Amino acid sequence: MNIISDKEILEVRTSQVFRFSVYFIDTSCIISMAVTVLAIFQLHSKQVFNPSTTRLLITDLVFINIHNLSYIFLQNWSLFRSFFYQTANDIMFKSEECWPHHVTNEFTKVVTVFNQFALIINRISVTIDSKRFSHANYGFLLAILSLIASTVFTAQQHFLGPIHGMRTTSCFRESDVVLDLKTEHIIPYLAICLTSIVCSLLLIIYVKKTQKTKTYDIESEYTKKEAVVSSISVAILGIIQLVLFCFYDTFLTIFAKLTAENPNVHDTNIIGWFYTSPLNAIISPTAVFLYISWIKKNRQMHIRKMTKVNKSENGCHFQQLSVMWNK
């Protein structure tokens, strides 16, 4: 472990690179909260998705913002100390005081990842049997299961408790000294994210294939089209979120290995700019807005198309009957 001088610690926390990064995430938080409230209102009022999917999407947006608020709290706590404390000893955090906040931050992040699993399961279930698995209670059950799974996963990652005697300049990571950056907690996130992305892509391929089978019942055809469009929308939204999570975790893992032999304490401020939670908190609800608009347009287009095709097919059918009867 490297010994970091008090002068270097003060430089890291009082750096304008660090302070401007906190100002940036504070501003982005205001935007993300406003967009999220509007997105949740749209999900409630427009009824674009079925009740079970809607409930899971709202849970997803809520926990993305809770995680973002947890991260912003930790960074602002560090910013506060950088302004009002004058010594490195006062600016530094004890592992014991950081641990509950760090675990809370990790838990809320894990919830958003496991919630993507729940959404994938939901869309597969709805595609198989839309009437049985579209109820709000099914979405509520999946949300509860994702919370339980997240609790177990987080407990397994942090059951050893705080690292006694360790002091860091931020409560965000257990060790923010680049040389001591631990990646064993990052690998499981990458595995979960990549698995979810693969499942989402397979779901898109599956629903695209089911789209090719046709029926002559307008209501059945409409229900099937609705399920296909909704499944693709939710899968793409999940992929966007998971890619954002994967980007930071992948970047952090690679960065830790590249700088292991020649670390620089100022690198921790650079890493902070690449944390994608604030960006995710804006992009996810914005994507919901875009997909609601897209689904509504597709719904109207498919209804017109199916009605037109159905009338044409019925016309041909009756014309053939007329020819047969007149023979």
Swiss-Prot record:
Gene Ontology BP terms: detection of chemical stimulus involved in sensory perception
Transmembrane residue ranges: 20-40, 56-76, 133-153, 186-206, 227-247, 270-290
Keywords: Membrane, Transmembrane, Transmembrane helix
Membrane topology field: Multi-pass membrane protein
Record keyword Transmembrane helix present: yes
Main subcellular location of this protein, as a coarse class: membrane
GO molecular function: G protein-coupled receptor activity; olfactory receptor activity
A Pfam family recorded for this sequence: 7TM_GPCR_Sra
GO CC terms of this entry: membrane
Compartments (UniProt record): Membrane
PANTHER family registered for this protein in UniProt: SERPENTINE RECEPTOR CLASS ALPHA-10 (PTHR31357), SERPENTINE RECEPTOR CLASS ALPHA-33 (PTHR31357:SF3)
Family of the protein in this entry: Belongs to the nematode receptor-like protein sra family.
Protein name: Serpentine receptor class alpha-33
